Amino acid sequence: MRIEQDLKLGFKDVLIRPKRSTLKSRSQVDLNRQFTFKHSGKTWSGVPIIAANMDSVASFEMAASLAQHNVMTAVHKHYSVEQWGEFVASQTAEVLQHVMVSSGTSDTDFIKLSEILAKSEDLNFICIDIANGYSEHLVDYVRKVRQAHPQAVISAGNVVTGDMVEELIIAGADIVKVGIGPGSVCTTRVKTGVGYPQLSAIIECADAAHGLGGQIIGDGGCSCAGDVAKAFGGGADFVMLGGMLAGHEQSGGEVVEQDGKMMVKFYGMSSQSAMDKHSGGVAKYRAAEGKTVLLPFKGSVDNTINDIMGGVRSTCTYVGAASLKELTKRTTFIRVQEQENNVYGKE
């Protein structure tokens, strides 16, 4: 047993200090990034926000909508190969280039992944996702997928420390997904006592990834546009959002009526709800590590994504960053004990 004495920080522990700026308007800020990925050699440009690979968030409808904003969607893994075929046939290359194909790590998952990728040469992104990215099995699976699909852009996770980021990049991942337990419907930290404050995880993992020419996705923990900006400021190349994009008409969640109001079911992918739906219930040897909530129906996701991007643009103007790429260099975090004045309720 050992104890690390360094304080680790989440988004609520800091604010970004403002700096002098020559920008006259938020409209001058460019949120598009261009990346050339280490192993695949592919180049992608767009707004590096990703809808999380949850079946009550990342539907085909969500992918089609967010692509119009140059934003990515990690489409959840529970669509069939046939459903993927129908989706691919109905969409343009521009939409498909903003889609990640999600995969588990079983032999069946590998076969399914290959069949989906064969549907279109415009499906370039793979999201290999398991809750515990510290498994040797994940590293072996990344190697296997890299060998089978050398031209694909592979993201893999989830992890929270630099050593495992390096391991996954060396094994063949272009991008590593960072975050254990910060999500709004994740209870891993409560059930297991395992986790890492998300901002510190992003800062440390970004340093490790960038040293090897890789990228990271900050996955989880964002509850407002300011948190998204803090994730980018901390060094995240991409930011993945679940709860912030749930509850919309494109999210795919079950709509129910409660007290005369339309509500949308949103749940973690290790929750009782998810395992009942996809695995025949919670296995006797494990515990559910997610919760199920009902969210007020939010309408179209277009309004929400515009609000998020508007907030990040505003952050950039406050620190003098003309582009999202400059935000990390212009960010100075200050530790705080308060975030906002809640006398009239939270925003």
Curated annotation (Swiss-Prot):
Gene Ontology CC entries for this record: cytosol; GMP reductase complex
Organism whose genome encodes this protein: Shewanella pealeana (strain ATCC 700345 / ANG-SQ1)
Superkingdom of the organism of origin: Bacteria
CDD domains in alphabetical order: IMPDH
Chain residues that bind NADP(+): 108-131, 216-239
Binding-site residues, K(+): G181, G183
Protein name stated in the entry: GMP reductase
GO biological process: purine nucleotide metabolic process
Active site: C186
Family: Belongs to the IMPDH/GMPR family. GuaC type 1 subfamily.
Catalytic activity: IMP + NH4(+) + NADP(+) = GMP + NADPH + 2 H(+)
A GO molecular-function descriptor: metal ion binding
The keyword Amino-acid biosynthesis is annotated on this UniProt entry: no
SUPFAM superfamilies in the record: Inosine monophosphate dehydrogenase (IMPDH) (SSF51412)
The protein's assembly and partners: Homotetramer.
Function: Catalyzes the irreversible NADPH-dependent deamination of GMP to IMP. It functions in the conversion of nucleobase, nucleoside and nucleotide derivatives of G to A nucleotides, and in maintaining the intracellular balance of A and G nucleotides.
EC code: 1.7.1.7
Top-level EC class: oxidoreductase
Keyword field: Metal-binding, NADP, Oxidoreductase, Potassium
